[in-house]
Regions:
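NAD(P)H-binding glycine-rich loop region in Rossmannoid oxidoreductase-like domains
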Residues: 27-64, 98
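Active-site Tyr-X1-5-Lys
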Residues: 95, 108-146, 164-172
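Glycine-rich NAD(P)-binding loop of the Rossmann-fold in SDR/ketoreductase-type enzymes
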Residues: 41, 60-68, 107, 115-116
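C-terminal substrate-binding subdomain of Rossmann-fold SDR/epimerase-dehydratase oxidoreductases
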Residues: 170-298
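Active-site segment of SDR-like NAD(P)-dependent oxidoreductases
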Residues: 48-52, 90-99, 107, 141-144, ...
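Conserved Rossmann-fold NAD(P)-dependent oxidoreductase catalytic core, especially the SDR/UDP-sugar
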Residues: 44, 70-112, 130, 136
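N-terminal Rossmann/SDR dinucleotide-binding element
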Residues: 1-41, 158
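Short-chain dehydrogenase/reductase
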Residues: 62, 110-118, 152-164, 193-194, ...
């Protein structure tokens, strides 16, 4: 999070002005932007987010996710911005075996990424008590899919998430490695909870409205509540792109099961994921790939 993009939204337009401000060297520029556009709320989506990279370079993750978030919070508070929504992660949870993760489940991150996000959650809880700022942390599970109505020219495409990697592998007629197929899951492969990016966007708006009307701090799981295995993803991609070559590789030291209990978000935020079935997620990802690679949709 070396810089922050500020986008001002109005009902009469899709998006208003966009500003690129360097953090922390030019954080004073936030004062002018906040005052000029009378900003009273912030949805904070920036940060570093790779689990593997976080263990190799934890300093970067604590700087971007903790130190710079604190700098941003302090500036917002100084300018009387009293509503803050933070993108946290399911990586804050401990290994929960085959059980759903509830907000009350043990938080014991196994990587620096999760630890950095959990640290910010603690900060938000303390800040909401000490200062006039209401905070919500949204614990994202596996965000996937695309807004196929967006203009791909303005968005970078990098296949670094599982579904995108499988689609890219299929188009290249390469072989996809499945790391482990003897886990105690329905088909032996890792299971994750995939939630469509458009449902996540809706959750942020719901959280923002909640923040404006409720004092203090809250956290919510944002997932689909649907367990999907790696093999099921491969099968779904094959429905669009045909047979994918696979091979089984040794299991890696990773969490093999992650699933959200989203009861709290449903009841308190009145949020329900509408686009997060795996067929809709994969279909949007295939279409996005074809849009960005100038190929017809299969």
């Amino acid at each position: 999070m070396e810089s922050i993009d500020i986008i001002w939204h109005k009902k009469s337009t899709a998006f208003g002005p966009s500003f690129d401000i360097d953090l922390p060297t030019n954080i004073q520029a936030l004062d002018d932007v906040i005052k000029r556009y009378n900003i009273d709320s912030c949805i904070h989506l920036a940060g570093s987010s790779s689990v593997g990279a976080s263990n190799k370079n934890p300093a970067l993750f604590y700087k971007n996710n903790v130190a710079l978030t604190m700098a941003l919070l302090d500036k917002l508070i100084a300018n009387d911005v009293n509503t803050f929504v933070f993108s946290s992660t399911a990586s804050v949870y401990a290994d929960n075996d085959l059980n759903k993760c509830m907000e009350t489940s043990s938080a014991l991150p196994s990587n620096a990424y999760g630890s950095s996000k959990l640290a910010v959650e603690s900060i938000l809880k303390d800040y909401s008590k000490a200062y006039d700022i209401n905070c919500v942390a949204l614990r994202y599970f596996n965000v996937a899919g695309y807004d196929i109505e967006a203009d791909p020219k303005n968005i970078r495409y990098k296949p670094n998430k599982l579904i995108d990697i499988i689609i890219d592998t299929a188009h290249r007629h390469a072989t996809f490695k499945i790391f482990g197929n003897t886990y105690p899951t329905k088909d032996g492969t890792c299971v994750r909870d995939y939630v469509h990016v458009m449902d996540v966007a809706e959750a942020n708006l719901k959280a923002l409205n909640y923040c404006r009307e409720n004092k203090g701090y809250q956290m919510f799981n944002i997932g689909s509540g649907i367990p999907t295995s790696n093999l099921e993803i491969i099968n779904e991609v094959q429905r669009h792109l045909g047979k994918i070559n696979t091979e089984i590789a040794d299991a890696r030291n990773e969490l093999y099961y992650s699933l959200a209990d989203i009861t709290k978000a449903k009841e308190i935020l009145d949020w329900t994921p509408a686009k997060s079935s795996i067929d809709k997620i994969v279909a949007s990802a295939v279409k996005w790939y074809n849009m960005t690679h100038k190929k017809e949709i299969q």
